[in-house]
């Protein structure tokens, strides 16, 4: 029997690597981690020991009757009570418990209550709790902020699901890992996924960057792995962060010929904040200038990542996404880390999903690309996503096929939303359309009212500031194809800072540029910027009539470059002085009714009547002045060049002396840059 690594022995014993590590520790064997080697003799002994234990356990299991499943802990339901419910008979109806039963149960506890008796809030809460309810007291609408209401409702849903999973923890099962591929632009993330999926993706990307997060599922040795591809460009920070929050494992791609770059550091920080394990894929090892050891040294120096083969605990796998070298080992390591992490879900309950991307599809309407985290998502399910609800009409898998059921960790596109869901919210399945509407309708109305009120106030403030301030402003209406793209464009524009110009984003949204966008741009004297969106015919016509500029882009770099040029065009030109000549005063002529005239010998360059003159005495700067008159002999001239002499009179009549040194400067207007 050859020597084996711990995880290889675990496979032979048909047990998890985590359990084997624990068993080896109890046996007193010194093994550091799953990659540690076990010698031949020890492997043989361990196989004998564990085979005997397995036989003993099998006999014991056959002799022992199967235990009854423990009764599940009751989930407390929430009930909202109004002031008029603080009467015993009304409370009984509210919680659905017979009045006589409540009176009897409370009497046993030593509390005497009458049917029409008024009770206080504490008593109402205590009674409700006895029968499995959590009482919450109604507040008038005006006292509850829109955001607080949304958070309360979503928090209630989240807590319900958490309670559900905690209650059914014995029924949780292992689900496929969700893996996010991160790294610097052009380090080979999309090419790696392309090689894994055996389809061409890299060639389809616009402008050299992945502009929307895509999720794909593959099978390796009979086990599923879900991959999320996140953009590498620095502008897509929030999209990368979203990917990290939705994932179980991060594969950090670092090019062996380029090393750790700014977005490598940023991507790793996202993974660290999300407390997600990282596997480093050192890519492009087929390149002539690839240096694996130097790349590992950078991982240590810049990220404090110590590779396993250097004594650390981070798995590093040298790969070539182009040739496919090392990819099988990378997939093996992903499955190993997933096994050690014991990634679980509750597959039988209602579905819970995380939104990777959402957009308005021209043919399907509002859609969301999601990863199912728990439960089974089915066609016909009713879903809640913040203030938006959905009856699932269609589920489309990562291969573009329509399916009926999506299982945990499966990436799917959901079709059927009333409007584009915000990627900040999770998706929860509820029991009925009525429940979905109840949770979302009021929230949606409040959001819309609040949005319109804020828009009006904000617009009035902007117009007032434009009138009162000399500082130039650029008002923008932004539209993008997805929420992720919109966020990236907002971040890009925010990076174009200037002390002279303030950028106001009057409105931003997802979808086609419409007539409302044009009217808002007109009211704020702004322009419309669209990213990967179309402009409807009516909006284009209105824009022409109103004189509103609409600029649309497909590539983020083009948008940035044009925005930069637009801002630079609004900047005041900068005055730059250019040294054009030098001279020395040889004689001072004091002429009545004229003043002092300096006789100057030009030493180099020239002097013109428009020059600024700087005066130095014994090497020390005295003052600068403008030329009042310039003469060559007795003629008024516009310009005199070295080595000629000239007579000049300054406008200020400052004290000039013989041997004073003069410098002549011409002023130019130069366009400022951001």
Swiss-Prot record:
Residues 320-322 are annotated as: G5. GO terms for molecular function: GTP binding; GTPase activity; translation initiation factor activity. Keywords: Cytoplasm, GTP-binding, Initiation factor, Nucleotide-binding, Protein biosynthesis. It is found in: Cytoplasm. GTP binds at residues 183-190, 229-233, 283-286. One of its GO terms (cellular component) is cytosol. The keyword rRNA processing does not apply. It comes from the Bacteria. PROSITE patterns: G_TR_2. PANTHER family: TR-TYPE G DOMAIN-CONTAINING PROTEIN, TRANSLATION INITIATION FACTOR IF-2-RELATED. Belongs to the TRAFAC class translation factor GTPase superfamily. Classic translation factor GTPase family. IF-2 subfamily. One of the essential components for the initiation of protein synthesis. Protects formylmethionyl-tRNA from spontaneous hydrolysis and promotes its binding to the 30S ribosomal subunits. Also involved in the hydrolysis of GTP during the formation of the 70S ribosomal complex. This is Translation initiation factor IF-2. The lineage of its organism: Bacteria, Thermotogati, Thermotogota, Thermotogae, Thermotogales.
